[in-house]
Amino acid sequence: EMMNYPGVLNKDPEVMRKIEAAKQAGKPIDGHYPLATGPKLKAYIESGISTDHETIYLEKGREKCELGMHVLIREGSAAKNFDALHPLLKEYPEQIMFCTDDAHPSFLNKGHINRMVKKSLDLGYDLYDVLRAASYNPAMHYKIPAGFLREGDSADFIQVNNLKNLTIQATYIQGTCVYDGEKCTLPFH
């Protein structure tokens, strides 16, 4: 996450070395520039930064998407931007992702990305656009080889009760059930 947006805009040599190292490693570079706009936003994106999870205003989100940036709609313990940004889900479904940020355990006990999925469906958004923001877009953007269910892939998936409520009944990682609807069976170290 490149939080030093002044360093990016001023082409600080250390900042630019970090960005170049991420590019050379084939890693996406996450942004942190909530109020960016105009030429500064364009320069920020042109430096190689591909996402922002700090967007708080709908118009800023639209501008970022228009310039090719991916916007992460976040719901965390402190910042909650879903209500302001959810229209982007219909307008730019290929560029929107859901995320949590600084989520406390008590917050996560009430749900994670699935909370935003349910809120989106309750608002009438297309199921496939919602699932795309919850899983496909992040997996593709971050090159996470999970959840595609292709032959030879690791069997990482969830089982839900139906396509309306999407209540998680089981979670599988590498083909092994790690959550059975009641308890997690992952070993904690």
Regions found by a protein language model. Give the residues of each.
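Histidine/acidic residue-rich metal-binding segments in metalloenzymes
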Residues: 2, 7-72, 77-98, 108-123, ...
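Active-site glycine-centered loops adjacent to acidic/histidine catalytic or metal-binding residues
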Residues: 101
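Short active-site segment of divalent metal-dependent hydrolases/proteases
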Residues: 104
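Active-site microenvironment of metallo-dependent hydrolases
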Residues: 108-124, 128-189
